């Protein structure tokens, strides 16, 4: 069997959820959209089911997958519904849709619902991606209430730069949210992962921890005690001696400056490892630090074994996880941990805890 695996530590997932809930102080939705950021939504939700206050997904199909797997807690649909036909299933399965534009209000007004919906009303406080702005927030709230088809209305917003504590954008968004929602009753939900960790003023009734659940710290410094949930590993499948001056891989990006011993690893960009990872990107081979050399191929990559004489065919190679911080790999590749995690595929997933 090909040795590429993603080891998912469910104890670490639970640790991170508890940390988020403790730091925030209120209830916390575990965000498991995008297949739990590549970790497996059903397995992650089941692991958190005994203690999570609820879950958040992007759209209806993701929620239905959780319901079919026995998840009974609150599930929020962060994109809301896409057409009126979805409202029947939303009601039937007890889901809470986000309402972020007027067409969704019209769907609710015109629908024949078996019972009132609890909804989350999204405020655009400065990210300018989705939601109602300024006075339109109050108007939307009044329309929803006047429809007679909604129960509790939770007011929410989303921060664009909460992971940049030195800039004032988040403080400005908080002020804009407070102005737009002044006088409107109901719970509030403001804090994403970065705000849970770095913006106490954003702590309200509901937090929405996402990336932090999976152990990738969104804040500079990474001193928040998160534990990595995914360890991406594979094995050395061949070893080659490379002479000084010899090129390696596509484009001859790497040229050996001295004789090198190279390990070929069964992992490539088709598995989700970034093709843009540069020479020198850290890896760990049999518990010892090493590095990527040469361009990542579709199914394979190459690592330096020169100073690891005991390493050879069958040696385990950690690409990120417990020993190799995913944020370090992402930064070198010019991307973010979110993208790397969501892109993992073609590997065997193994769960523990």
Swiss-Prot record:
GO terms for biological process: D-alanine biosynthetic process. It comes from the Bacteria. Coiled coil: none annotated. InterPro entries: Ala_racemase (IPR000821), Ala_racemase/Decarboxylase_C (IPR009006), Ala_racemase_C (IPR011079), Ala_racemase_N (IPR001608), Ala_racemase_pyridoxalP-BS (IPR020622), PLP-binding_barrel (IPR029066). Substrate binds at residues 129, 298. Pathway: Amino-acid biosynthesis; D-alanine biosynthesis; D-alanine from L-alanine: step 1/1. The modification N6-(pyridoxal phosphate)lysine is found at residue 33. GO terms for cellular component: cytosol. Its EC number is 5.1.1.1. Keywords: Isomerase, Pyridoxal phosphate. Its cofactor is pyridoxal 5'-phosphate. It is an enzyme of class 5 (isomerase). SMART domains: Ala_racemase_C (SM01005). The keyword Isomerase applies. The active site is at 33 (proton acceptor), 250 (proton acceptor). Belongs to the alanine racemase family. PANTHER family: ALANINE RACEMASE (PTHR30511), ALANINE RACEMASE, CATABOLIC-RELATED (PTHR30511:SF0). Catalyzes the interconversion of L-alanine and D-alanine. May also act on other amino acids. HAMAP family: Ala_racemase (MF_01201). This is Alanine racemase.
